[in-house]
Amino acid sequence: MTLPRRPFPGAPGIHRKPHDRRRLWAVSTALLSVLLVGVLALKSSGTSDSNPSANSPQCRPTKLLVPRCGAWFGAYVRHSKPDLEKNVLAYEKRIGRTLDIVYTYHDMSLGGLEGQLLTEQEQRVGKKRMLLLSWESKRWNGTPAEQPRWSQIAAGALDKSVIDVQAGRIKAYGKPLFLSFDLEMDTRTPASGTPAEYVAAYRHIHDRFRELGVTNVVWTWIITGYTGHSELFRGLYPGDAYVDWIGYNQYNYYRCHKAQWQSFAQTQTASHDWIRENISAGKPLMLSEFGTADEPSKPSAQAEWYEQVPRVVKRLEGVHAALQWNFRDPGPGCDLSLARDESWKSLRKAVADPYFNQVGPGS
């Protein structure tokens, strides 16, 4: 299968304002005594600023799979359709935990496993994990003339042969899952159609699923996050009524695109802030693909990059899922997978953080 090439932004770093501090210039002895009594009373009453346990009722995920007290951790693990479970288990062994979300791709071909949402392997993996299915309006082994266009999808031309069939499979699966239609669609216009045609196609699939009684889809709109495409993003957004989560895919490409080395914070912050200011102030956000190239001249660089992940995700308001991309992109220097044991150990430590260990749906 062919995976999309991802543009990269020149994202600036994070600039955080210091918290305001109040200074007390004069306090009488009597007032100080009152304050001390109040502090002691608070301590004795058990008041605490500590975060609630992931097992507490207030931290249970919502119907739209939003963890209330932290974030999910997931990954795209390199696989072919028949060996998904084996490769997921091998990845989990190295990071020391079960993935919350497993990320897979599908096209709209009419035969074989590539066009079949929820393969037997995905259903096996999905017993203990959530799934993010990336559904692309492509036929990876087809000719240019066979590639679906957004206008065709919007007009219902693929309903009987593709849309209805896959809707039925998802409905039969029953469990909630994340579904993305044409992730990184900002790289596919005008080849697949106009932004307006994409929106019409997305809405048609959404509405068709609803007509067919499919209620277990969490609709996930995923863009590159490349800030140079900001005007495209505005025109490609299907609207709040059609989107449950917003995702974006940003990397430290480094030598892959002859870019400067960027920290995890630098790769994520500009896109996050732009989405919050221009697309949605309240939708849950997903770092649907993140990762970094290696730096052979500094073997510790990749490990140090992953060390930042928990700290940065916690301060990116509204980010409730982060998925590591453990594969390569096309081109020289574009291997974004974990390169050495030190990198694996760093990621293992990062995803052991309690923030990434929330109670799953149905637990």
Features from the language model and the residues they span:
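Aromatic- and acid-rich polysaccharide-binding/catalytic face
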Residues: L99-D107, L133, F233-S263, W325
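N-terminal substrate-binding region of glycoside hydrolase catalytic domains
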Residues: C59, L64-L158, T292, Q324
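C-terminal region of N-terminal signal peptides and the immediate post-cleavage residues
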Residues: V37-C59
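Glycoside hydrolase catalytic-domain groove-lining segments
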Residues: L117-E136, Y251-A293
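Substrate-binding cleft of secreted/luminal carbohydrate-active enzymes
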Residues: S56, T62-H79, L177, P284-S363
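Acidic (Asp/Glu)-rich catalytic clusters
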Residues: L89-R97, G115-L133, V165-G174, G235-A241, ...
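Substrate-binding cleft of extracellular glycoside hydrolase catalytic domains
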Residues: G111-W221
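Aromatic-lined carbohydrate-recognition surfaces of secreted/lumenal glycan-active proteins
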Residues: Y76-V77, D182, H206-E231, G282-E295, ...
